[in-house]
Curated annotation (Swiss-Prot):
This is Benzoate--CoA ligase, peroxisomal. A motif (Microbody targeting signal) lies at residues 578-580. It is an enzyme of class 6 (ligase). NCBIfam families: PRK08162.1 (NF006020). It comes from Arabidopsis thaliana (Mouse-ear cress).
Length: 580
C-alpha cells in the first residue's frame, strides 16, 4: 500500500469556508441571519461574503494580511468570519470591552492592513489610533465603517463604507473558486488575543484545519441537529464565538444577531424567532433571572445553553433550568480554538437527586471528538494524576485543533507546548468517570463575567501608585460576575504610623486606589475591594503566598455599589435607584 500516494482528489485542505458554500447549495430557502428587520438567506450571505472578499482583494489584501474589526454581534462581524479568510487574509476580532491603551497594543502588535469599525466604537477607536499615531507619525491605517440605521452615514476617517464594499465587489468564477480552495490547511484563519496587556500581548494564531475540526467537534458534542436557531449572546470576538460562527453554517442554521445583551432583548428574540441554542458565560444566567414575570414563565420549547468561561454555581444552573433552559457546561481556551471539554449528560444521572445532577452539570467534562488527548499531570514529575477526583494537577491537552502558536512570541509558544502538550495553566482533577473538573488557575488568572483578567497587570498598575509598597491581586467572589479582583496592599510606613484613625485612612486609601485603577485599566479589570495589611504572607524564598490571600478573599463580600454610594453621601438607596 506504500505506493498509494496523496493527490488532489484525496487530499483537499480542510477549511470552514466550505461550510458556507455547502449551506448556500443545500439550504437555498433557509434564513441565515436575522438582525432586527434584516433577513438574509444562505445564498444571499454567500453572495455578500464573495463580494466582500473580492473587494478586499481589490484593495490589495492578500495572503496572511491581518484584517482587524471592532464590532458587536452584527451581521457584518458574522460575514467577515468568512469573507476575510476567503480573501486569503487573517481575521482579528478585537475585544471591544478593552480600553484604548489595550486596543492600541493589539493594533501595534497585529499590524493590520485595514480596520473595520462599527460606528458605536468610533470614540474608542479614535483614542486608540491617536495613541498609535503619537508613536508613529507615518501611521496610515484605513478604517472602513460599518453603519447602522440609527447612525447617520458619514465617514470621519476615510470615505470607506462596509456596504459599499459589498456592492462594488465583482467576484469572477475563477476568483470564487480560489476563495474556497486554500493551498495549505495549516494557514492562519484568525488571530485572537488572550489579553490586551501593553507589555506582552499574546496573539493566538488559529489555522483553517484547527477551526474546521473544532467546529465539527463542537456541533457534534452539543448535538445541535439540523437548522438550529442560534442566538448571539456570546461575543463573536471570544474565540470566534466558540467557533459557532462557522458552526451555524455547517448545520444550515439561523444566526439571530444582537447588539446589546439584556434580559428584554434575549427573551424577545427567543420568543419571536423560536431560538433553540445559545452560548454564554455564567454571568448571563443572572441576566436571564432578571426578566419580568412573563419572561420567567417556562419556555414552550427548550433552549439549549452552552456555558463556559468560569464554573457556574450549581444553584444558579438549577434556577435557570427551571425556566426551560437546558444547560451544558464546556471548557475551552483561545489557544485550543474553542470548546475542548463537554459535560456530556449520562442517562443514569437522571435517576440522581436534582442537587447532585446540578453538581455534575457544573463539571467541565470529557474531551471533544477532535481532541487527541486530555490529561491532568503533576507539573514537576509529569506523571498523570489518579482518577480519584481529589489529586490535583495541571490540565494538559493535545490535538489538531490546537493553535499554531503565539504571534511573534517564540518564547511563550515554546513554554505553552512543553513536553508535547498544550499546557493550559489550569489546575484540576479527573474523576473516576473520566470527567475533568477545574479547581484553580496556576497563573492566577481571574475570570470575571467570562473575561480573563491578569492579576499581574492589575498589580503593575497598583505599584505605580506613589504610596503602595507591596501588592498582590487575587480573585474574590462577586454576586454578579462570579469573580472580581481583590487587591491586598502594604502601604509605605509613612502611611501607617497613625493607628488611631487607621480605619478612616484605609477607607480613604481604598477609594483612591480603586479610582486610580479605573483611570488606568478597563473597568472590568479594576479591584472591587482593597485589603490593607502590615505585610504580605511569604515563603522562605520571599515569594508571596497567594493561596493564603485567596483563602482570605473567599470570605470577603462585595457590597452592592448603589448601597456604597448611598452610604457615602448619606442619602436613601431609592434616591439613586430612581436615577439609574
Amino acid at each position: 500500500m506504500d505506493d498509494l500516494a496523496l493527490c488532489e482528489a484525496n487530499n483537499v485542505p480542510l477549511t470552514p469556508m466550505t461550510f458556507l458554500k455547502r449551506a448556500s447549495e443545500c439550504y437555498p430557502n433557509r434564513t441565515s441571519i436575522i438582525y432586527g428587520k434584516t433577513r438574509f438567506t444562505w445564498p444571499q450571505t454567500y453572495d455578500r461574503c464573495c463580494r466582500l472578499a473580492a473587494s478586499l482583494i481589490s484593495l490589495n489584501i492578500s495572503k496572511n494580511d491581518v484584517v482587524s474589526v471592532m464590532a458587536p454581534n452584527t451581521p457584518a462581524l458574522y460575514e467577515m468570519h468568512f469573507a476575510v479568510p476567503m480573501a486569503g487574509a487573517v481575521l482579528n476580532p478585537i475585544n471591544t470591552r478593552l480600553d484604548a491603551t489595550s486596543i492600541a497594543a493589539i493594533l501595534r502588535h497585529a499590524k493590520p492592513k485595514i480596520l473595520f469599525l462599527d460606528r458605536s466604537f468610533e470614540a474608542l477607536a479614535r483614542e486608540s489610533l491617536h495613541l498609535l499615531s503619537s508613536e508613529d507619525s507615518n501611521l496610515n491605517l484605513p478604517v472602513i465603517f460599518i453603519h447602522e440605521n440609527d447612525f447617520p452615514k458619514r465617514a470621519s476617517f476615510e470615505e470607506l463604507d462596509y456596504e459599499c464594499l459589498i456592492q462594488r465587489g465583482e467576484p469572477t468564477p475563477s476568483m470564487v473558486a480560489r476563495m474556497f480552495r486554500i493551498q495549505d490547511e495549516h494557514d492562519p484563519i484568525s488571530l485572537n488575543y488572550t489579553s490586551g496587556t501593553t507589555a506582552d500581548p499574546k496573539g493566538v494564531v488559529i489555522s483553517h484545519r484547527g477551526a474546521y475540526l473544532c467546529t465539527l467537534s463542537a456541533i457534534i458534542g452539543w448535538e445541535m441537529g439540523t437548522c438550529p436557531v442560534y442566538l448571539w449572546t456570546l461575543p463573536m470576538f471570544h474565540c470566534n464565538g466558540w467557533t459557532f460562527t462557522w458552526g451555524t453554517a455547517a448545520r444550515g442554521g439561523t444566526s439571530v444577531c444582537m447588539r446589546h445583551v439584556t434580559a428584554p432583548e434575549i427573551y424577545k428574540n427567543i420568543e419571536m424567532h423560536n431560538v433553540t441554542h445559545m452560548c454564554c458565560v455564567p454571568t448571563v444566567f443572572n441576566i436571564l433571572l432578571k426578566g419580568n414575570s412573563l419572561d420567567l414563565s417556562p419556555r414552550s420549547g427548550p433552549v439549549h445553553v452552552l456555558t463556559g468561561g468560569s464554573p457556574p454555581p450549581a444553584a444558579l444552573v438549577k434556577k435557570v433550568q427551571r425556566l426551560g433552559f437546558q444547560v451544558m457546561h464546556a471548557y475551552g481556551q483561545t489557544e485550543a480554538t474553542g470548546p475542548i471539554l463537554f459535560c456530556e449528560w449520562q442517562d443514569e444521572w437522571n435517576r440522581l437527586p436534582e442537587n447532585q445532577q446540578m453538581e455534575l452539570k457544573a463539571r467541565q467534562g470529557i474531551s471533544i471528538l477532535g481532541l487527541a488527548d486530555v490529561d491532568v499531570k503533576n507539573k514537576e514529575t509529569q506523571k498523570s494524576a489518579p482518577r480519584d477526583g481529589k489529586t490535583m494537577g495541571e490540565i494538559l491537552i493535545k490535538g489538531s485543533s490546537i493553535m499554531k502558536g503565539y504571534l511573534k512570541n517564540p518564547k511563550a509558544t515554546f513554554e505553552a507546548f512543553k513536553h508535547g502538550w498544550l499546557n493550559t495553566g489550569d489546575v484540576g482533577v479527573i474523576h473516576p468517570d473520566g470527567h475533568v473538573e477545574i479547581k484553580d488557575r496556576s497563573k492566577d488568572i481571574i475570570i470575571s463575567g467570562g473575561e480573563n483578567i491578569s492579576s499581574v497587570e492589575v498589580e503593575n498598575v497598583l505599584y505605580k501608585y506613589p504610596k503602595v509598597l507591596e501588592t498582590a491581586v487575587v480573585a474574590m467572589p462577586h454576586p454578579t460576575w462570579g469573580e472580581t479582583p481583590c487587591a491586598f496592599v502594604v502601604l509605605e510606613k509613612s502611611e501607617t504610623t497613625i493607628k488611631e484613625d487607621r480605619v478612616d485612612k484605609f477607607q480613604t486609601r481604598e477609594r483612591n486606589l480603586i479610582e486610580y485603577c479605573r483611570e488606568n485599566l478597563p473597568h472590568f479589570m479594576c479591584p472591587r475591594k482593597v485589603v490593607f495589611l502590615e505585610e504580605l504572607p511569604k515563603n522562605g524564598n520571599g515569594k508571596i503566598l497567594k493561596p493564603k490571600l485567596r483563602d482570605i478573599a473567599k470570605g470577603l463580600v462585595v457590597e452592592d455599589e448603589i448601597n456604597v454610594i448611598a452610604k457615602e453621601v448619606k442619602r436613601p438607596v431609592g434616591h439613586f435607584i430612581s436615577r439609574l
